[in-house]
Amino acid sequence: MPEQNSIRIRGARQHNLKNVNLDLPRDRLIVFTGVSGSGKSSLAFDTIFAEGQRRYVESLSAYARQFLGQLDKPDVDSIEGLSPAISIDQKSTSHNPRSTVGTVTEIYDYLRLLFGRAGSPHCPHCQRNIAPQTIDQMCDRVMELPDRTKFQILAPVVKGKKGTHVQLLSSLVSQGFVRVRINGEVRELSDNIELKKNQAHTIEIVIDRLIKKEGLQERLVDSLSTCLKQAEGTAIIDILDKPTLAVLDGGKKDDKEALKAAENGQAYHAELPKEIIFSENFACPEHGAVMDELSPRLFSFNSPYGACPDCHGIGFVRSFCPDLVIPDPEKPVYVAIAPWSEKDNSYYLSLLYSLGQHFDFQLQTPWKKLTKEQKEIILYGTEEEIWFEGESRYRNKQGYYRRFAGALNILQKNYDETNSDAIKQKLEKYIINQPCHTCGGKRLKPEALAVKLGQYNINNLTSVPIRQTLERIENLELTSRQAMIGELALKEIKARLQFLLDVGLDYLTLDRAAMTLSGGEAQRIRLATQIGSGLTGVLYVLDEPSIGLHQRDNNRLLATLTKLRDLGNTLIVVEHDEDTIRHADYIVDIGPKAGIHGGEIVCQGDFQTLLKNQRSLTGAYLSGREAIATPEERRNGNGAKLTLQGCCHNNLRNIDVTIPLGKLVCVTGVSGSGKSTLVNELLHPALQHYLSRQVAFPKNLGEITGLQAIDKVIVIDQSPIGRTPRSNPATYTGIFDSIREIFTQTIEAKARGYKPGQFSFNVKGGRCEACAGQGVNVIEMNFLPDVYVQCDVCKGARYNRETLQVKYKGHSIADVLAMTTEEALTVFENIPRAVNRLQTLVDVGLGYIKLGQPAPTLSGGEAQRVKLASELSRRATGKTLYLIDEPTTGLSFYDVHHLLNVLQRLVDKGNSVLVIEHNLDVIRCSDWIIDLGPEGGDRGGKIMVAGTPETVAQHPSSYTGKYLAKVLQS
């Protein structure tokens, strides 16, 4: 391969890579594949991308480098032919609640620009178009009235204010005005006008009374000028008497001039407004709603100029949840309010007692037996003042009249005003995020939401699925001026929306919080953004872009990757998806297995080369030499079932779902069809509410039945098992407790009186204090990356010399942490409690990982399997429900085979497993399928079919069934 057309890697030894030498073609779509933990990410991200990023950063000044997070130099001899590198992975999803799909893709920035420059402001109260008008424009509008129309010009000086307004009326007389209109009635100022003090009044000066005719303009301009001066820029044209109009199709015909006008084809007016309101200000003439001059910042929820004043642009507020404050409605009133049921609550008891006296309930009455009104009074307070009697906070006997603020408001005040972290922490468990009442979750202030472009405000474009947003943008009803101003912004918005459609994200909305996106969705959004940038000559490194994507949408993703390549870029894609592997220009298979058994280039070349390679596990499954067998029989389950009724959250359309227990159940459907909503946002919280009462029951779920068949619910996801190097597989699974106990039984440990704490690297005693048990010391280098230096005292062993002198079968505690699971299984083969947990790690395919491997270095798939192993080693109750969201993420065909064996074992032990999955191997091996659809977003949310894989495969309208039928036949 010519040097200039290739990326040449020599001596790559990062992590488990074994001195890899590799030449990769430029401007091609390259797929790195292999089993989980084989070294794919180590080569793609930690070597190739890291070196490309490091070289770019090193080209900057030392001053600039101190502001950039730098990557360490990877362990590689050389990389030649490297282009500027951009990483698109799953780990960099924003956790900022202010970040949305619109802001990440920058579409929202263009929308802000568009509305700020071409928008049309309206009154937030009456939706009247707000625009400043000159006197000439006002005069022209009045002169459009039919001839002989009688009208009067009014200057509103008081709008709905209480008072007698004696001074104002006296002032008007002295200025020479004759009449005023008060509360809709015209009165002479010479009359003795007496207004009620406690009543709201509207007062308008009658400036002039006129009849529309030719030659009226000069007097009209003078009168309007006087009116605008008196009413601070506002004028009202009150139509007093409409002229008789001629209508040729029928009606009055006694006006000869009108008839003549009609016969000559001149315009005539069938309807006239009762009033015409003018304003020379940027304000609503009726409600006085003032609009600042439009600018993009008015539409930014991250700016004080545009953000909702109550939620500050987040869209939700943190407030106390009634379901958490009253977790058990069976309890009597005096202990039902959980935060008040703890010790020293006599003050609150006296409040409740007084409320009971006034509103006729007993403190011993169960909460659920109170009337709706009584419950609302206790929670939200009273408008009227009532008599309270009892001890004050300071133990003084007293009585007084006052309003009761309500338990929720009292708790909120206590939380907001306390300086005690302990009190805040205690109250936090009763607080949830709830949509802001002021903006309804729209994030913006009313003035911003009242600005329209064509027929839509900005929320009308961001709150609907992207597919619908594009339709609305293309059908905007714009004036020629608006179209000219917005031409470039509209072009950019349409292009970026189309890119999102191309990667299968048509069901998302632009106002969707980025923190709620799955890893696959976030990655495809960044992929769409990169296509929009139009860069060429770039090296893109992607991590499984097909995650969370239904088989139906794969072709759209592949077309996007091809488009990015055809722009003149090189793509390295870490992927396990068969369609992507087949579509690749060049394939690199890394393995043959994981960890110390991997790190080699097993195969490189095209798809046919991969199929023929006898060492490649990927090739073995793709060629059919290895296969995951479809179960011959489907389980009947244990007869129990969970039934969710009235599911209407997000896009779910008030569906009823039945989940059989004692089975492996798959929830399937295209991306955005409602799978995660059903399982993660309805089923899981409902189960938590039932089991612990520490989570509110989902508002958009009618009811759930069959809960007595479940005593534990466990979510197994791909989040890290720990955030620090102190956490590792040994500590997470509990193996380390057994190992430390074993070491205390040695002769040396007994002689020294060592307890299990001596062998912990987290507490003082046996650990090395020079590095606090970490094995390394961190040295901050300012504009260079932090350097991790092996501890000089313990040489990375984590323990002090005395602890390391204690040996079991010739191995110190540090030696054991450095062992792989397989090696440890041999060492502790005679210790049943250790063997049980170690064997489950081997069974889930993690025989290669070290017991002390820091948690942050584990892949998502590895972390998930550590959790599965931990669950497998526990004694089964037969009433546990496992919820697993896309467990095949990051797993090869070989790993999926292992995973399925583990899931089947969990079910065989009497448990129930519910999986959200797109992988057809997992779906066809399940006992029951619940398929949602038919499409994503607002076109999804229905149950297409529920039944065995064979039943689903026969359904004519199910996309899942269509692809499932093919694999079942093969």
Swiss-Prot record:
Gene Ontology MF, one: excinuclease ABC activity
GO CC terms in record: cytoplasm; excinuclease repair complex
Residues that, per the record, bind ATP: 34-41, 669-676
Domain ABC transporter: from-to ranges: 340-617, 637-965
Localization per record: Cytoplasm
UniProt KW keywords: ATP-binding, Cytoplasm, DNA damage, DNA excision, DNA repair, DNA-binding, Excision nuclease, Metal-binding, Nucleotide-binding, Repeat, Zinc, Zinc-finger
The keyword ATP-binding is assigned to this record: yes
Record-linked InterPro entries: ABC_transporter-like_ATP-bd, ABC_transporter-like_CS, ATP_grasp_subdomain_1, P-loop_NTPase, UvrA, UvrA_DNA-bd, UvrA_inter
An annotated GO BP: SOS response
Note from the entry: This bacterium is considerably more resistant to UV and gamma irradiation than E.coli; the E.coli-like SOS regulon model is not an appropriate model for DNA repair in this cyanobacterium.
Assembly with partners or alone: Forms a heterotetramer with UvrB during the search for lesions.
Family: Belongs to the ABC transporter superfamily. UvrA family.
The protein's role, per its UniProt record: The UvrABC repair system catalyzes the recognition and processing of DNA lesions. UvrA is an ATPase and a DNA-binding protein. A damage recognition complex composed of 2 UvrA and 2 UvrB subunits scans DNA for abnormalities. When the presence of a lesion has been verified by UvrB, the UvrA molecules dissociate.
UniProt-recorded name of the protein: UvrABC system protein A
Species in which this protein is naturally found: Synechocystis sp. (strain ATCC 27184 / PCC 6803 / Kazusa)
